[in-house]
Regions:
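Cys-dependent protein tyrosine phosphatase-like superfamily
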Residues: 1-137, 151-157
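Short cysteine clusters
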Residues: 141
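Ser/Thr-glycine-rich phosphate-binding loops at phosphate-binding pockets of nucleotides
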Residues: 148
């Protein structure tokens, strides 16, 4: 019984998450995409909590950057952004792509799953990409903890 309720709530949340936030081309679309970014992607928490840390000279890890974070990265001289989340037609990706282009930041996507162990070949590819990207570089996932932490540790090996 409880598992059915949990599954129903998960489906309800997923349906809400996927019902809006996919358009930033109009004033109204940008408004709703920002609502989506703040509430569904939990960006409002990242206003107060920024998981930005240097892991090696010229290599940083962070949580999902907001447009203001990307502006700060540009001021720090960061040249590249490596997203471990992958491409999605969702608010967080639309805003990140738009602002990286606007700021002249090199945005690369090398996704790894947040819900299962990554394949070794995917990790090797990410480390190769990370080593080849113009530095300074910041890598991120949603929270800057699990995926970003794993890739950071592997990079240091």
């Amino acid at each position: 019984m409880i598992s059915k309720i949990i599954k129903a709530l998960d489906n309800f949340e997923r349906n809400i998450r996927n019902s809006f936030g996919k358009d930033i081309s109009t004033k109204s679309g940008r408004f709703w995409a920002n609502v989506h970014f703040q509430l569904m992607d939990h960006a409002f928490i990242r206003i107060f909590w920024n998981n930005f840390h240097e892991i090696s000279e010229g290599v940083y890890r962070a949580n999902q950057p907001s447009p203001s974070h990307l502006k700060s990265y540009k001021k720090l001289g960061i040249k590249s952004v490596l997203s471990l989340r992958g491409r999605a037609n969702q608010s967080y990706d639309l805003f990140e792509d738009e602002y990286c282009k606007r700021l002249g930041l090199n945005l690369i996507y090398t996704p790894i799953s947040s819900g299962s162990a990554p394949m070794p070949e995917d990790l090797l590819k990410i480390i190769k990409v990370l080593r080849e990207l113009p530095k300074p570089v910041v890598l991120h996932c949603k929270s800057g903890a699990d995926r970003a932490g794993l890739v950071s540790a592997l990079y240091l090996l």
